[in-house]
Amino acid sequence: MDQQVRVLWSRLLHLRSSAAALAAAPGILVVAERHSRLVRLDPQTGVPLWEQNVEDCWGTTVVAGDRCLYLSQAGVLHCFDVHSGQRTWSTPKLCLCHYIIVAGSVAFLSGWRGYRPLIRVDLTSGELFPGQLPGSAPGGSLAWPLPVRLDPERSYTAGAVLLASASEAALLLVDALTGVTRGEWSLPEPVRFPDSGVAFSAGEDGRIVFLSGRRTVMVLHPASGVEILWRHDRDLRSLPPILSGRTLWLTEDTGVTTIDLDRSSRTAVMHLPPGATGEGVPVSGDALFARAGNQLIAVNRAGEIAARVRLPARIDRLLPDGRSLVHAIGKGHLTTIDISTTPT
């Protein structure tokens, strides 16, 4: 099978929005732009569907079911109906928060690099839950929390969240409603993550892959615990590995390596364009990586470049929509790419 990577459309955001100001779900795309607008766009065409005024375009956007949340840099958390754009509630005085994830009926907020402890907000009312969660003491660098589906056989996501700190060699799974610890796992070294805080890559089968230290790739399945998948022979970039089936994609400073876990064999991707490799995302059984020079490359399981395309601006973040689209935001541009697979 061959990958086809095609640019569908590109939109000028007029200001350099935060990379976290973009959120996507199947059939849904929302971005903060033009200093003070939150806009829902048609993912296929880029046509605006609704817009609302917010405080800035440097905050964090999340889509969760029928809700869209926007946490402004000014410290106001807004909740909108994702279909109509109607504002449901707004909660102020949440300064120094940056991370948002939703688990069940609860939104988790935390400060970038742990500048503010993890807090919980009721999605129905916007009210804060009392108390402080375990593992959320201020002063420690916290990875972006991850909602965890405890029962992959069910269609809904159970209300639990995975926590990791740059200073503790452990993972913590916390119940969203009660704050009670549901699981705790020791690691060889603390979870390693970049300045953005994104540490985990979650697969559809419930496996969560991450770096423990600079060279060890590990996987967590909440039902069975953690295990070491691969020990690399040199330092990896502080970016989440990608795991699909029994294939790993690892990001090094200037290159990409694929690992066949069944054979314990590795393949360095050849003929890469010059420059650094950025984050990657899984696409149709392969992996898509941002490269210096505004380039995207699709790398297959054999370690071959299956497709490449150049975008209008530098790529700060890639965000799949859960179907065949990938959205790229960076340097004042939003670009949507269609990833299709064709028989060879």
Regions found by a protein language model. Give the residues of each.
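Secretory-pathway ectodomains
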Residues: M1-T344
